[in-house]
């Protein structure tokens, strides 16, 4: 039997199907952020569709535009990818097919307002939407307003995972799209100070690692672990799905929030300025970070931009990153270690914490790769390590579906851990909902290799050896878990 896959009949049928999809899609490509990187646009171009014989029937929806995740109903093509990833990978069941007949569409389950659901803002639905019907709330405008205000000092921090992906849409290789070229571009846009969230990741390790060692006797007695608190998607998840476990979270702020708190206390004092004059911006691979900066406890961070938003800023400023010379982070909040860099990959927080916990217990550094068994993209990993005669059982999970299985096993007493790291996005922050759009898992593996390569080549691979962290404690916080540290760096 001969099967023809590109006959006139097949081509006509494909074109008709795509035209029918387009008839329910707002194809104003010139104003769509997915233009040039849109599956539907690509197919329409490949099929040479130049006219539409059908009238457009576009869905109307009143979406809360203040929510960090935005849905444009007129762009939705009912492909069900958001439903599939939310149900089958993340297990959150936020999206569903609603209404009947010609009014059938995809929307929030039970026609709820998105803010009323258990949505963690992991953003995996956004990453998998092929047409731009789901996007992040654009906060570029308020950031540019702050930059142009001469009375405001703009400070920006760059998350570890961002350096693995920011150059992808510009066609830059991983080796060329360095954090230093990103710094150069941001300086051209007009930020006053450009720092590295890796510094705050090292601070987080000092606080969280010390907290773990302090809580370890109680952990052993209760049989319940301490959980990391770096991922706001995970924090929202545990509070809504397993509220009885919320008290097991580390009290240390996430690196983003810790950086903001340090900027508006220690750094403001060093500059001799009113903290209210500082506008702190985060560049994150994540939608949930936009929500985290609004949580109770003070306005540590004023605005969060995703990696994609920064790419659009570069294009709006006609910046060609491939032509930029490298520039260095500002100090003292711009110095990080390899331990802080690997925060962007699943298992990275755990490995970094164990490196410094070993030092805090023994007074000696372990081999920097002694805890690498927690690395990898598996959804749920576990390991046991000896800390000066005490066996520490740890687990690492990424993806909320895997996390739910882990949490249920802990509740049932099927597994017992002392320390657990959770990231809401499969693979960790490198696969965050604010990263450049990807078509396969290969890109995630490449991003992971970038982080571990940076760690391997770094002269400093232990958070406790970061000289800027030491300086910060000597000049302001005294020591991890001090009274001032608890007031400013913990919730």
Predicted regions and their residues:
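Fe-S ferredoxin-like electron-transfer domains
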Residues: 1-121, 127, 134-149, 153
């Amino acid at each position: 039997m001969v099967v023809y896959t590109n006959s006139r009949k097949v081509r006509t049928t494909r074109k008709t199907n795509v035209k029918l999809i387009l008839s329910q899609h707002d194809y104003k490509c010139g104003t769509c952020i997915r233009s040039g990187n849109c599956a539907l646009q690509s197919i329409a171009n490949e099929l040479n569709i130049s006219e539409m014989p059908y009238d457009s029937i576009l869905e109307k929806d009143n979406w809360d535009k203040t929510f960090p995740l935005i849905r444009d109903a007129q762009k939705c093509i009912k492909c069900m990818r958001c439903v599939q990833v939310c149900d089958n990978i993340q297990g959150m069941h936020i999206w569903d097919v609603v209404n009947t007949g010609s009014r059938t569409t995809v929307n929030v389950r039970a026609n709820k307002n998105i803010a009323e659901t258990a949505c963690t803002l992991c953003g995996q639905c956004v990453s998998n939407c092929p047409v731009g019907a789901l996007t992040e709330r654009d906060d570029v405008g308020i950031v540019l307003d702050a930059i142009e205000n001469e009375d405001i000092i703009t400070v920006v921090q760059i998350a570890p995972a961002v350096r693995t992906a920011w150059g992808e849409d510009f066609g830059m290789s991983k080796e060329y799209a360095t954090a230093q070229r990103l710094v150069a571009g941001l300086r051209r846009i007009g930020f006053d100070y450009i720092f590295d969230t890796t510094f705050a990741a090292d601070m987080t390790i000092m606080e969280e690692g010390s907290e773990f060692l302090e809580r370890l006797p109680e952990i052993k007695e209760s049989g319940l672990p301490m959980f990391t608190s770096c991922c706001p998607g995970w924090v929202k998840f545990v509070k809504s799905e397993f509220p009885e476990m919320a008290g097991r979270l580390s009290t240390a702020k996430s690196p983003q929030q810790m950086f903001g708190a340090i900027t508006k206390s220690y750094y403001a004092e060093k500059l001799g300025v009113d903290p209210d004059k500082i506008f702190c911006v985060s560049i994150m691979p994540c939608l949930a970070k936009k929500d985290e900066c609004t949580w109770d406890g003070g306005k540590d961070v004023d605005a969060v931009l995703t990696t994609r938003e920064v790419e659009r800023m570069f294009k709006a400023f006609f910046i060609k990153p491939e032509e930029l010379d490298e520039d260095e982070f500002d100090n003292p909040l711009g110095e990080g270690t390899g331990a802080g860099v690997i925060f962007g990959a699943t298992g990275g927080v755990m490995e970094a914490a164990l490196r410094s916990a070993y030092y805090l217990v023994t007074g000696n550094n372990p081999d920097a790769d002694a805890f690498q068994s927690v690395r990898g993209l598996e959804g749920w990993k576990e390991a046991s390590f000896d800390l000066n005669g005490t066996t520490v059982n740890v687990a690492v999970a990424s993806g909320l579906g895997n996390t739910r299985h882990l949490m249920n096993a802990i509740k049932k007493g099927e597994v017992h851990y002392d320390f657990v790291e959770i990231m809401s996005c499969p693979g960790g922050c490198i696969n965050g909902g604010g990263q450049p759009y990807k078509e396969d898992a290969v890109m995630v593996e490449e991003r992971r290799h970038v982080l571990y390569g940076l760690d391997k080549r770094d002269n400093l691979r232990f958070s406790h050896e970061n000289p800027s962290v030491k300086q910060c404690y000597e000049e302001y916080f005294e020591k991890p878990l001090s009274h001032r540290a608890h007031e400013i760096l913990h919730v």
